[in-house]
């Protein structure tokens, strides 16, 4: 039975009963409790049911709600999926990773969910997803909630060394031979504090961002350990980055 078929049957159960438990879904569909909870989570995120403790409730009207689960709507979605998959393969069991905000970041977090790695993030949609999926080790960086970016930002001068990771994965609005550019200054400044305490900095940007310069310079090219991007990225820019010691992976 496919996921789509399971979802259809689950919604039909709710239409008849109004409420179903995880145990009832397991019994009806012949699936594991983890799969049942995952199906309920996905249908909740898409507004087709309401997730409640130990089950789900029917809703009379679907909620028009955008969440990171609607990533198929993101620009260059397929390329970002490939980038996220490639990035996840860099991390070894037992390591810790810092993942920042954005659609590619969420895709990466989804790829790593369930693996024996510690995920450090200030991106609340990703943190909520990891908690819902019962990922073993999640650290949420503290600070003031920034509604526009759905992240937490720590006060100026606060100590971030507690959040040092083996890897830091980040993206931006543009990448040139000079380095990575970000447009949100507060977010960029908060992330910059961590550059000196992470093991390796990996930039994840789709090919449309290569050669673009927008906002503030977040990190110089010589601070970047690796770039993962699409196959259509500007080859001239990639050569200039390689000359400065940046490892390039095109997917």
Swiss-Prot record:
The keyword Transcription applies. Its main location: cytoplasm. Gene3D superfamilies: Winged helix-like DNA-binding domain superfamily/Winged helix DNA-binding domain (1.10.10.10). It is found in: Cytoplasm. GO terms for biological process: DNA-templated transcription; negative regulation of DNA-templated transcription; regulation of DNA-templated transcription. Disruption phenotype: Cells lacking this gene show a more rapid utilization of L-ascorbate and are able to grow on L-ascorbate under microaerophilic conditions. It holds the Pfam family DeoRC. The keyword tRNA-binding does not apply. GO terms for molecular function: cis-regulatory region sequence-specific DNA binding; L-ascorbic acid binding; ligand-modulated transcription factor activity. GO terms for cellular component: cytoplasm. Keywords: Cytoplasm, DNA-binding, Repressor, Transcription, Transcription regulation. Residues 20-39 bind DNA. Residues 3-58 form the HTH deoR-type domain. InterPro entries: Carb_Metab_HTH_regulators (IPR050313), DeoR-like_C (IPR014036), DeoR_HTH (IPR001034), NagB/RpiA_transferase-like (IPR037171), Tscrpt_reg_HTH_DeoR_CS (IPR018356), Tscrpt_reg_HTH_UlaR (IPR023711), WH-like_DNA-bd_sf (IPR036388), WH_DNA-bd_sf (IPR036390). Represses ulaG and the ulaABCDEF operon. Two ulaR binding sites have been identified in each promoter. Full activity requires simultaneous interaction of UlaR with both divergent promoters and seems to be dependent on repressor-mediated DNA loop formation, which is helped by the action of integration host factor. This is HTH-type transcriptional regulator UlaR. It comes from Escherichia coli (strain K12).
């Amino acid at each position: 039975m496919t996921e789509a078929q399971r979802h259809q049957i689950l919604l039909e159960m709710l239409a008849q009963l109004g409420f179903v438990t995880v145990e009832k879904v397991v019994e009806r569909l012949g699936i594991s409790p983890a799969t049942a909870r995952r199906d309920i989570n996905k249908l909740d995120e898409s507004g087709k049911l309401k997730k409640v403790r130990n089950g789900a409730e029917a809703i009379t009207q679907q909620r028009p709600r955008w969440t990171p689960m609607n990533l198929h709507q993101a620009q260059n979605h397929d390329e970002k999926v490939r980038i996220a998959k490639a990035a996840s393969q860099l991390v070894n069991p037992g390591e810790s990773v810092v993942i920042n905000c954005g659609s590619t970041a969420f895709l990466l977090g989804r790829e790593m969910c369930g693996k024996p790695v510690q995920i450090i993030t200030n991106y609340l949609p990703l943190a909520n997803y990891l908690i819902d999926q019962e990922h073993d080790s999640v650290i949420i960086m503290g600070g003031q909630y920034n509604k526009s970016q759905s992240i937490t930002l720590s006060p100026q001068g606060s100590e971030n060394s507690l959040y040092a990771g083996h890897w830091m994965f980040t993206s931006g609005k543009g990448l040139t031979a000079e380095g990575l550019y970000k447009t949100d200054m507060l977010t960029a400044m908060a992330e910059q504090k961590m550059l000196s305490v992470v093991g390796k900095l990996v930039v994840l940007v789709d090919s449309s961002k290569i050669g673009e310069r927008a906002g503030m310079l977040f990190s110089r090219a010589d601070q970047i350990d690796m770039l993962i991007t699409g196959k259509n990225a500007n080859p001239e820019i990639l050569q200039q980055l390689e000359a400065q010691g940046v490892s390039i992976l095109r997917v």
